[in-house]
Amino acid sequence: MSEPASASLLRYIDDQTSPDDVLANAVEHAQEFGIAYPDASTGQLLATLAALTYPLGSSGVVVAANAAAVIGTYVARAVAEDTRISCIEPDIEHQQAAQKALLSLGRPSSTVRLMTAQPVQVMGRLAKSSYSMVIGDVAGKDLPRFIELARNILAPGGVLVLLDCLLDGTITDPTRTDRDTVGAREAQEMLAAMDDMFLARLPFGSGMVVATLAHE
């Protein structure tokens, strides 16, 4: 595919996506704070995965990302009204934006859980083997621990989505020894060694990984 064709395709996808007020407000919040957020293609993929997997877990979906408002909006529209969405984010302003977005969609407040903390600090408290989907956009240095914790809470058949985790391919550069690159590199090695996870590495953002936990 040529670069011009690729750019045309992306424009077409964007043109076919008309954000409503809830999504537009969530995107505006992300832009105001300089937060990376999923584009239309990524958001639609997240919604599709959420729709496919939500019946698998009794505890719902975990969103661990600064852009929880944007991600949560895509996910919430794809799952049942009583599906719990747990947003984990240390910044209270981003949490409030996520809560506002989810409640604006008409979701019951009982289905929106906010955990104001670093994901790796609190995910160990979540119920094991009971979540249908875990979406994470975390620092590279935290990825190995995040993957370990996410694997523990996924229900069989559940999906782990790691956004922007391939660092535009720089993890293959042996001269990059900063903590985030080393952590991202270790995370990929961890995933490759898990024989009960089926992986797809996708060129969305700076590199996405979708990992599905095998059914028992």
Kindly give the residue locations of the regions a language model identified.
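A short alpha-helical cap/connector motif
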Residues: M1-M133, V138-V159, C165-E216
